Amino acid sequence: AVIEMGHRYDRPVVPGALTPTEILTAFAAGADMVKVFPANHFGPKYFKDLLAPMPQLKLTPTGGVDLDTAADWLNAGATALGVGSALVKKDLIKARDWAGLAALARQFRNIVDQTRNQS
């Protein structure tokens, strides 16, 4: 019902899942992409393993994605990156360091651009 409602209003629907069965169930129900959580417990190889027989899947890792692992996830086939605390740093927010937050966002964007340009 949630996926159907999202599509009714032309919104992308990205439910969370972990196991291959959960991921396939979400896509069969019409999900546009599936966020895999907690991705860091399985690592980028898990995405490679999932995508080998099912390359049509659009997956985004969430949980533990940071500047050190972003390229690994993209190289493993991630369609997007779910980045939380590695991008929205509490200390930068508390200090109202918007330039610092913007710099972090640029670093992530640069990694995405560099990784995608390599393929």
For each predicted feature, which ranges?
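Glycine-rich beta-to-alpha transition loops that act as phosphate-gripper elements at the mouths
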Residues: 15-20, 39-41, 60-67
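C-terminal helical cap(s) of enzyme catalytic domains, especially alpha/beta-barrels
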Residues: 6-8, 74, 90-118
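Short beta-strand/loop segments at the ligand-binding rim of alpha/beta enzyme cores
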Residues: 5-14, 53-61
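Catalytic cores of alpha/beta
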Residues: 21-29, 46, 65-81
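Glycine-rich phosphate-binding active-site loops on the catalytic face of alpha/beta enzymes
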Residues: 1-2, 35-44, 76-98
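Aromatic/hydrophobic pocket-lining residues that form π-stacking "cages" and hydrophobic walls in ligand
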Residues: 2-3, 22
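Anionic-ligand binding region
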Residues: 9-11, 19-34, 44-50
